[in-house]
Amino acid sequence: MKKLFGTDGVRGVANVYPMTAEMAMQIGRAAAYIFKNGKKRHRIVIGKDTRLSGYMLESALMAGICSMGVDVLLVGPLPTPGIANITSSMRADAGVVISASHNPFEDNGIKFFSRDGFKLPDETELLMEELIFSKRIDSLRPTAKEVGKAYRIDDAQGRFVVFLKSTFPKDLDLSGLKIVLDCANGAAYKVAPAVFEELGAEVISIGVKPNGTNINADCGSLHPEVMSRAVKENGADLGIALDGDADRVIFVDEYGNVVDGDRIMAICATEMLRQGTLKQNTLVATVMSNMGLDIAMKRAGGQVVKTAVGDRYVVEEMLKGGYNLGGEQSGHMIFLDHNTTGDGVLSALQVLAIMQRHQKRLSELALVMDPLPQVLVNVRLAEKSDIMQVPEIAKMINDVEERLKGEGRVLIRYSGTEPLLRIMLEGSDEGDIRCWANDIASIVEQKLGGEARG
């Protein structure tokens, strides 16, 4: 069982174990040893978002990697998918992302991409942990003559802008569109506005003044109400909101209504079905996706394959099954024909291409899917336990499932990145399922302690 790595790398409060400079250096050393293969000069890319603690962790990782005889390529603030792309295009041995994605600025994280731009398998992360905790890495240092160097790649953002524009159809542009763009004061604050403006859109940018502590603060994909308000105030055609590392995206239509990842997947998948480009007529989603997505895909002649929650599991299923489109309700979307991981700006470009191709507004395209009412309640718990072993909780869940009569579902799972138990209900009546979700949350609080929040 892994001690450091969760579903999306190592994550925690900055300057508190495990997100300390000391641990970052050890992680860098272990990674460098693993990716060092053969006699050639090895290189690892390091990129980050805009958190204040990114400077500390970047320096520590760089020192650890160089101490093992591997060179470092520093790209500075860059979206997570940009780091995956640069790692692959520069033929580096690996890429490192310093980010806690949508979490508040106090948190930070470290995750890796392999040389081909995909997230690491569990086996590699376990090997990294074994090297760190066994102290074996201490005996593997190279000589002073063999230590690595660090180089800064000054044009990384420009390279990624060029790549992103290359995924947009050559016969289309964005002229005539007014877009509100919320970059969450995060990693895409320069890249995203440049992409949409260079393709011809009028862009109203918010969340583009990072100061190290305002990433995701009342902005970005977790706060679409900010973008929604700006769309209505400015008479924009749509709004696009990214999270702190720009690997996910949420939209609002011209009326300010939120269009989530499920509806965006439905729009893109059904268009790809019409074009004959959706491999095996299959979309990969997670168990959190609304049942309305399954219905929309079936109606269009396709199908949905479900995975555990986490974009890494979506990608694993896509690679295993030979599929080329997958994603999550939260707005992670993977277009494997273009990139190897979730990419908010790239996903937005695919939606904009459909709008421009068919001259339809986002509100019209969103009608492809009719979601079932869905309610999510989070309970913050001190530790994870098997809730079905608590008789009162198990009885409450079983009672709710009986009331749904097969016309909805109950899904309860622990977050992979936060100390939260997520209680999700779907059904035909939103009032009923909200009441039942709160009932389950209340009994969990009573029996296990904790604090519920909607």
Swiss-Prot record:
- Which coenzymes or cofactors are required? Mg(2+)
Q: Name one Pfam family in it.
A: PGM_PMM_IV
Question: Where does it sit, as one GO cellular component term?
Answer: cytosol
The cofactor remark states: Binds 1 Mg(2+) ion per subunit.
Q: What is its EC number?
A: 5.4.2.10
Stated role: Catalyzes the conversion of glucosamine-6-phosphate to glucosamine-1-phosphate.
Q: Where is the active site?
A: 101
Name of the featured protein: Phosphoglucosamine mutase
**Where is the PTM Phosphoserine found along the chain?**
101
Q: Which UniProt keywords apply?
A: Isomerase, Magnesium, Metal-binding, Phosphoprotein
UniProt PTM comment: Activated by phosphorylation.
Organism, scientific name? Geobacter sp. (strain M21)
Note the SS bond partners.
none
